[in-house]
Amino acid sequence: MLYRIPVSTVGYWHSPWQIHQFLLPIERFIHRNPMLQLDPISKTTHQHSGHKGLVMAIGGAEDKVRGRQILTTFCQRAGGLDAVIGVIPSASREPDAMGRLYHDIFRDIGVREVDILLVGDRADAEQEEMLARLSRCTGIFMSGGDQLRLSALLDETPLLYQLRHQVWEGKSILGGTSAGAAVLGECMIASGGSNEAPNRSLVDLATGLGILPDVLVDQHFHNRNRLARLISAISAHPDKLGVGIDEDTCAMFEADGTLRVLGRGSVTIVDPRDVSYTNYAHVDVNEPLSIYNLRLHILSDGDCYNLRTHQVQHKCILPPLN
């Protein structure tokens, strides 16, 4: 169960970071105490029957200079030369510079129209002009940075509602790298440690954007030794599928329910469906976790995972471009 503390309880502060700084200790306490029942999210909030638009979750540090395999694929799937790419650089501490970086990359790849959607505060995400610009986009790209900042800016705003609608209805494809990938689930990893055995204190969880409600994403995965923290997160939310994505690697969530791997690293699937026992509810926060029958897959470029049947396929055939 995931719980939300409504932003309205603290009002609109000058900075979304202040909101999350205020809420983070509360969210940590709630996520480490699953028996608490504070304002549970309505099941209808993120309920959908599957997304018709491609979602590309990138593990960060994607190639921006040479082959640009992942970013080129994103542009191709968004419509090629005729694509309209909207860049949301709001997770970055320097959103203007980040926006210009991806603007120049996508233009260099060949996209004629790239729009930088600067969301500096929650009021920006409510403007009709911003919604109109988003509605024209065939591809939407969320940059890296701080996933807490991005979530604080977009969560429960008209911009997020429209973004989800466009992706779920197949009107746009969505790409997110690093923090932009971490926010895709209903629950997201806000921060955490590494180089430890899985335990309840290893990861801090927060509310994501709910674009892929059944998935919990981690990024820079093997590069930063994050398997233990993803397992710790999945132990707290065994109804989610853990997806750990390496740098310069992409998990492509296709409309047909296939997860396809693209890039030079790997994607790790942590599947808790068959877990028969965990001591999660019975140990102190710093004690190691026991988890029985946790299933793990490591997939490389071209491999696929069926999100409906939970079967893996080696080097599956690429679909035609949209």
From Swiss-Prot:
Gene3D superfamilies for the chain: 3.40.50.880
Q: What positions does UniProt annotate as the active site of this protein?
A: 178 (charge relay system), 196 (charge relay system), 220 (charge relay system)
- What are the TM regions of this chain, as residue ranges? none
Record-linked SUPFAM superfamilies: Class I glutamine amidotransferase-like
Pfam families from the UniProt entry: Peptidase_S51
Q: Which terms does the record give in the GO molecular function aspect? A: peptidyl-dipeptidase activity; serine-type peptidase activity
EC numbers listed for it are 3.4.15.6
Look at the named UniProt entry and state the broad enzyme category this protein falls under.
hydrolase
Reaction catalysis annotation: [L-4-(L-arginin-2-N-yl)aspartate](n) + H2O = [L-4-(L-arginin-2-N-yl)aspartate](n-1) + L-4-(L-arginin-2-N-yl)aspartate
Q: Which UniProt keywords apply?
A: Hydrolase, Protease, Serine protease
Q: Which CDD domains match?
A: GAT1_cyanophycinase
Can you supply a Gene Ontology BP term from the record?
proteolysis
Please give the NCBIfam families that the UniProt record associates with this protein. cyanophycinase (TIGR02069)
The entry sums up its family as follows:
Belongs to the peptidase S51 family.
Q: What does this protein do?
A: Exopeptidase that catalyzes the hydrolytic cleavage of multi-L-arginyl-poly-L-aspartic acid (cyanophycin; a water-insoluble reserve polymer) into aspartate-arginine dipeptides.
Protein name according to UniProt: Cyanophycinase
Its source organism is Thermosynechococcus vestitus (strain NIES-2133 / IAM M-273 / BP-1)
